[in-house]
């Protein structure tokens, strides 16, 4: 009787520890912004720590801000090595239930960008391919993703984002943003800072700082 009870208890405890929470309830995922199109989480996992098993119900892109050596485990499967570097971008289809353990010596941080819906747009063309500083790094049925790299003094020139999107700073930087009919803005950015825009927007970005500036632009199709 005691042995049977102990076995049942072990099974129940295993079920508790294996149960998953929605991503918004996972304590290392910090919700920073949400509208009808996007949810943005700032994720931080210190060395030796792990997320809970959590479920992503929406497709998402993540931008690695601080890389680390990880173990990633999809629920029901064995853990696998996942070594990410700063600036790395990946797209994941939903649904996904998983957890991540930081087995390295550095904090792991990323910006997780959930795609809730697609704004109405008149174009699905890759609108930044010929813009200075931009390189297409990911393209699928949901998003275009570009890496932006500007050395000190470099500028994108005036260009138009035809699609709604989110820009995420990967490095520190001081940039000057100029839009037609508006005053120039000088903005100091930290890694993980982000900006959302709905609909088309036209501007130029110039690196007015003393170090290379890197960012990632995610455009909704």
Model-derived regions: residue spans:
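Short beta-strand segments in beta-sandwich/barrel cores
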Residues: 51, 68-72, 89, 156, ...
């Amino acid at each position: 009787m005691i042995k049977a009870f102990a076995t049942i208890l072990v099974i129940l405890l295993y079920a508790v520890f294996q149960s998953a929470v929605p991503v918004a309830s996972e304590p290392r995922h910090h919700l920073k912004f949400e509208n009808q199109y996007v949810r943005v989480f700032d994720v931080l996992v210190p060395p030796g720590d792990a997320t809970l098993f959590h479920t992503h119900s929406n497709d998402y892109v993540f931008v690695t801000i601080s890389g680390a050596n990880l173990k990633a485990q999809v629920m029901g499967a064995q853990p696998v090595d996942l070594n990410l570097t700063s600036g790395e971008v990946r797209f994941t289809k939903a649904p996904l239930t998983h957890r991540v353990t930081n087995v390295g010596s550095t904090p792991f941080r990323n910006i997780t960008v959930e795609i809730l819906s697609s704004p109405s747009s008149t174009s699905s063309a890759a609108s930044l391919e010929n813009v200075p500083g931009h390189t297409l790094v990911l393209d699928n049925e949901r998003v275009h993703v570009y890496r932006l790299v500007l050395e000190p003094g470099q500028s994108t020139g005036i260009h138009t984002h035809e699609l709604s999107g989110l820009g995420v700073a990967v490095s520190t930087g001081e940039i000057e943003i100029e839009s037609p009919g508006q005053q120039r803005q000088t903005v100091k950015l930290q890694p993980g800072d982000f900006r959302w825009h709905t609909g088309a927007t036209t501007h130029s970005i110039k690196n007015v700082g003393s170090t290379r500036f890197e960012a990632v632009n995610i455009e909704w199709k």
